C-alpha cells in the first residue's frame, strides 16, 4: 500500500533533507520511494514543503501529492499555511510543539506531538539561530506511523553524515522516537 508524507517547515530547518532521509530509509527496507521538494526562490526562514511517497511496490504515479496520509510540521510558526489541506480523514498530523493547541485548530485529524525544538537545542543542533529538527521529527514519524523503522532512519542518517554530525542526528532521531507524545483525536 502506498503512503504519502508531506513535510512543512521553514528554510533552514531541514525539510528537504527530512524527505530525502525518509526516502533513503524506506529504500533501505526495499520499498518503492519518491521524494520531491516544493519551494521558490525564498531564503532561510521562508515556508518550504517536501513530499515523499513510500510503497511496498514500485511507484508508477508521477505528479503532485495532494492527499497525504501523514503531515509533518517542523516549524511551530507556520501561521499562514494550512498544513492539514488535503490530509486524508484517517491521516495523522505530527507537530513540533510542546503545549496543547486549541482543539478546533486541527479538527478531525489525529495529532501527535514532540518538542523537537527543545531536543535540538539540547543537542546543539542549531544553525544560524534555527533549531534543526528534521531528524527528530523523522524519529517521531517512524514511531507514529511505522512506515519505516527507527533503525532504517538512523542508518540513512549515518550514511549521509558518517561522522559526529551523523551520530548526533541519529541520537536526535532516537529521542524523537522515544519522546513522541500521544495521539489525540481532535475536533
Residue ranges and their predicted role:
Residues 1-187:
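Active-site cofactor/cluster-binding pocket
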